[in-house]
Amino acid sequence: MAEPLRRVLFVEDEPALRISYERYFAGRYRMAFAATGSEGLALLEAQPPDVLVLDMRLPDTDGVALLRQVVARRPGIPVIVTTAYTSIEPQLAVLGLPYVGYLLKPFDLDDLAARIDAA
């Protein structure tokens, strides 16, 4: 009997990237998508994922604040942080917060898949 697909919540405001995730990971994961931090928190409660992929820059909040809320609501959930920020400040901002991966955009989707699978 096949194992059930892992549930992955992608919190990403870029429509093109959400479409890329949906197409690339179809059949590999059960996916849910949120374009804002508030949508992400609602889905986190309504459909708890096995893994969260979190963009650091969202229209209604920043990723650090959202990561703190996620940790408070769902301690232990594996979080993979993604960002287009190339400076060191975003990396320093999440130090001390639990996450299992940090990817700079653009990144290879196979790399993201490997991190999701390992989480």
What is the predicted role of each segment?
Residues 14-32:
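Two-component/phosphorelay signaling modules centered on CheY-like receiver
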Residues 33, 58-61:
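Residue-level signal for the "D+5" position in two-component response regulator receiver
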Residues 36-39, 62-65:
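Acidic catalytic/metal-coordinating carboxylates
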Residues 45-47, 69-76, 97:
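Conserved phosphotransfer cores of two-component systems
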Residues 47-53, 58:
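Active-site beta3 strand of CheY-like receiver
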Residues 65, 86-102:
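Alpha4 helix (beta4-alpha4-beta5 surface) of REC/receiver domains from two-component response regulators
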Residues 89, 107-117:
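C-terminal output helix
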